[in-house]
């Protein structure tokens, strides 16, 4: 929920989102340590495990986006063009949304052998950033990071905050 007064915004749901992402970051940190100590991290399933927690994080952020859009009665397509831009040239919000959709749907796409029409934009955004199918979300998260640390909180929350501020200055539509 967004509370607005005198040009200040307090996103009370953001605190809960941050708390969840911190839990997921703790899991990612444990996985990174395990990777360093593993002779076969891929065979040990550590990369898949990391990808899972990253996907959960992106979906939680997507839910936060949707809650904000509903609260402000703003068009989703327009809203995902707002806020900071990713190095790929697409808005960070659009990349986060695509990452969440990727995590939810990529298994069925590959099982069916094709990406449906409504998934083509997601596929394009993620492949433009990752350049590979395996561990695509890890690559997307890394593309947001200024360091080698994979942190949903440090890498993504600033973009969520900027996006929320941009929602408040754009006309509703």
Where are the regions a protein language model picked out?
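Charged alpha-helical initiation segments
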Residues: 1-44
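Non-transmembrane, amphipathic alpha-helical segments
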Residues: 5, 9-12, 16, 42-53, ...
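Generic structural signal for well-ordered, non-transmembrane alpha-helical segments
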Residues: 15-18, 22, 55, 59, ...
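Amphipathic, Lys/Arg-enriched alpha-helical patches that create a basic surface
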Residues: 21-34, 55, 63-71, 119-173
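Short, contiguous, well-structured surface segments enriched in hydrophobic/aromatic residues
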Residues: 36-90
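Long, hydrophobic, amphipathic alpha-helical segments used as structural scaffolds
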Residues: 65-76, 104-111, 171
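Sparse recognition of residues in long alpha-helices and their boundaries
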Residues: 77, 115-117
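Histidine-centered, metal-coordinating catalytic motifs and their short helical/loop contexts
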Residues: 89-115
